């Protein structure tokens, strides 16, 4: 099977514990169990100081494994850098909020502290989940104040864009590729040691 072929190729690549590992679509053909095992192997390699170059269309796997990315489409560099910084740069100022009981956000919306509050579908025993949008860089504390005045806050986290969402936005031209400065002479070589 393709998964077994992939395993043999990966084992042959990693048996000598290389300092630099290049993996092209390593999750292709793997079931979830073998995909999880490969994640563990990659984590061990990283812990031992290996540099791993990963080429993949599996954006959730890339998000799980990589700390730094280069997003390339048709041979053109669209975006590169630390994944956490990239997600922060393209955030939508949205928050996922869970409460013990329903919350009325209408006063906060009317006051301009919140743009929208969408109640997400839920099962009977689950907390109430909302997707909250706030204006630009405004303070998210207003969300917490609104909730705590009416209910118990179960969870609160910022919803950052998924890497697959960013890829689609860039590939469709909704975002402009990052500008790459011309390298000076000192930057034109790559040192491998």
How would you name each of these model-derived features?
Residues 84-88:
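Short acidic-hydrophobic catalytic motif
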Residues 57-59, 83, 100-102:
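Histidine- and/or cysteine-centered catalytic micro-motif in compact active-site loops
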Residues 1-54, 59-73, 79:
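ABC transporter nucleotide-binding domains
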């Amino acid at each position: 099977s393709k998964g077994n072929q992939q395993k043999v190729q990966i084992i042959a690549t990693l048996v000598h514990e290389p300092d630099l590992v290049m993996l092209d679509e390593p999750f292709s053909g793997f079931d979830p169990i073998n995909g999880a095992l490969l994640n563990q192997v990659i984590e061990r390699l990283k812990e031992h100081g290996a540099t791993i170059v990963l080429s993949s269309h599996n954006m959730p796997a890339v998000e799980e494994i990589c700390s730094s990315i280069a997003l390339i489409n048709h041979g053109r560099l669209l975006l590169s850098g630390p994944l956490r910084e990239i997600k922060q740069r393209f955030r939508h100022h949205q928050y996922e909020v869970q409460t013990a009981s329903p919350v009325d956000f209408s006063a906060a919306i009317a006051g301009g502290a919140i743009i929208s509050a969408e109640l997400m579908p839920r099962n009977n025993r689950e907390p109430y989940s909302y997707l909250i949008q706030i204006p630009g860089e405004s303070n998210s504390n207003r969300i917490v104040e609104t909730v705590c005045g009416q209910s118990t806050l179960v969870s609160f986290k910022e919803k950052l864009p998924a890497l697959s969402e960013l890829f689609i936005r860039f590939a469709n031209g909704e975002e402009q590729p990052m500008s790459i400065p011309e390298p000076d002479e000192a930057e034109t070589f790559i040192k491998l040691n």
